[in-house]
Amino acid sequence: MTKIHIYFIFILVGLNSAYAQNLYLKDVYTNEPISFGKIYPEFEKPFLSDIDGKFKLVNVNQNFSVKATSYIDTTITLTNGDSIIFLTPNLKSLENVTVKPGINPAEVIMAKVIANRKKNHPLENDGFISKQYSKYIFDVDQETRKNIFDTIMFPKPDSNIIRARNFLDKQYFFITESASRHFFEPPYKEKEIIDAFKVSGINDPLFSTFAQEMQSFHFYDNQVSVLGKQYVNPIAFGSLNRYLFVLEDSTFNQNDTTYTIYYRPRLNKNFDGLTGRLFINTNGYAIEKVVAEPFNKDTSGIDINIVQEYRFTNNTKWFPYKLSTTIDLKTAMITYGKEKNQSGFLQGKGSTYIESVSFNPKELEKERFNNVSIQTSDKANRISDTTWNRLRQNELNSKELKTYHVVDSFAKAENLDKYLFFAKVLATGKIPVSFFNIDLKRVFNYNAYEKYRFGLGIETSEKLMKPLLFGAYFGYGTGDKTIKYGGYSTLFLNRKTGTKLNLYIQSDVSEVGATKPFFSPGLFSNESLRYLFVSNMAMQEKYGATFSTTIRSNMGIQLDVNRHNLNFKNGYQYNGLSTFNALETSLIWSWNIREKVNLIGNQRVSMGTNYPRFQVQFDRGWIPTDYTEFLSYSRLNLSISQNVTVIGIGKLSWSFKGGMANGNVPLNYFFALQASRQNWSVSVPNSFETVGVNEFYHKKSASVFTRFTFNAIRTKAKWNQPQFGFHYAYGIGEFENKSEHNIEFKSMDKGLHEAGIFLNGLLTSGNSSIGLGSFYRFGYYSNEDWKKNIVPKIVVGFTF
């Protein structure tokens, strides 16, 4: 080797040590990265660190200062080998905002951001394929960690604190990773396939979508989803009137400028808003970085902070590059000492890295899209370590490896999969017992006809037979004093598409004039609440078969063929008869427009939709007569519903129900009105609150229900968040030849009107609320005594 080679090597080594060194900003107590700190070098222009606190100095032989939100300003002189800059939290830092008269420069900038929102939107204009890697770690919160590490320095520290310190030094509480491919084709075709996931202690795909559920993929929609809740975006149309914007800083880059803008909801503005900082780049006035958290803390004890970083990718557009989430689970308390104040809570920190972005690739033309937005591959939990090392951004450190090892061993010893299986079944309203499930919905129920209904339902679980299910139930009503029972068998042909065949036999009550929903109503659904008031029922012996499947992920059909016997118990007769036999076929078609579905293993989880939901049901039946002839009937029923969020104001819910029926048949084969009148009972949306359940029946009818609920008024009391709302319902219908039926009822030939006002949230607790409402019937079918048109009710609300 010549001297020139030796000199050249020395020069390279010297350059490597003096130039272009990667440095990191970290919290002195938690060792966590500090995002978007501003670096002020002595001989260079100021710039920002990235989402992981990483930055690079061209020349490290210089002093520099660092400023970061909520941290003490620090001046640094690097010594040999330094790569981590530790900053100390400024625990007394507050957001002091002074509003001055005149033109607000931040609003001028934000107006340009809002004007360019659609152009910069990642899911507009260009299709793409990208790869993503996510990692989430759960540890003790920052303040608790600081207290533990400070207390350990005392002369005689508590042994519990020593154990806590040793634990926190070696491992975390929980870790999860996932890797996925993201596909998008304009205008709205989108899907994400999770190819790999790994969760400490758990092998179930239920946790595979954890990263996707934490925050939105981008920050450009009118509503931003944070932990499943919707917040008004500060760059949404109209946000200049809703949000206060303050220009804090400007950072000059090579060809453009980055503005740092603080934002929060304006005073006396009542909406679910965010607060944080936007870093706006003058290249297209796009988001370069954003920090956001809910302005009003959640009463559930869960706080969350999100951070996103964008890059001008492939010289085409700004695109998400890194996503970060911090979630504080303040209800998950952790005690580390003997003193009362020696406790903390669980804190999760995670990052998602987006790479290999390709805009409008030819491969996109070969992809098949449906409404399954996220799908977990069948082998995603069986990925080799070699593949994982290739998918990860960085190798796992010793604490992360230790977490996997310890938690996996603990889970295996304690059989955590068994408890997870129990929790999944319990979420469906069933309790697993060995190879069977007990259906809680069959244990107790109430309606105005049966009064208190007690019973038991039991069915086989997947542990016994996966493709086949057998079940049976019985019940007894204290009102009608009659035993009901039934049995069924379900063959799951394809769980992913919801394709199944169900055979059933039952002897049970059935509401006269009811229509069948495509999906079984939930415990707190409007249909379940209305069922409390149903008092006109017939005893029905029925056997048949039902086939159901999904044509698309948001569209399904259900075909039912049955033979049933109706026995009216309340004195009702048609043509002198109270018992009827019928052969019936039913076809139900359901379509939820633009609904997104997550396919996790074999489980389909709806993510909801902001667009209308349609259901069409057609019934065709034949009733044999004494003369060996048949009386035929047909029923066509249409229902449409939608929930619309009016940004910054509230939510509008509306539904339409209409039907047509023909045939000379009993009342059961026509339509009962959706009604729920009873003073001081529970208010039932999408029903006539002032109408008795047996007051109206129709052969043809149409009803519209609307309800607008304003955003909650923020108060200082956690138990009180008042929400004003209005209700209006209208119906019209007809029923000729009422005299053929021996009971008295009306039809809405002249049009039925009612309106109401309510105040919910007088008392709130967690995800539930309670309030009061008053509803009034007016028009042709109102009572001459105006006081009898008023129906007071209790308004309840549940959010999950």
Language model feature labels by segment:
Residues 92, 96, 100-258, 265-273, ...:
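Structured extracytoplasmic
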Residues 229-231, 367-800:
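Exposed, low-structure sequence patches enriched in small/polar residues
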Residues 21-28, 53, 85:
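A short, amphipathic beta-strand motif
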Residues 21, 28-43:
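Short, ordered, surface-exposed loop/turn motifs in non-cytosolic proteins
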Residues 41, 65-77:
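A short, solvent-exposed loop/turn motif at the edges and junctions
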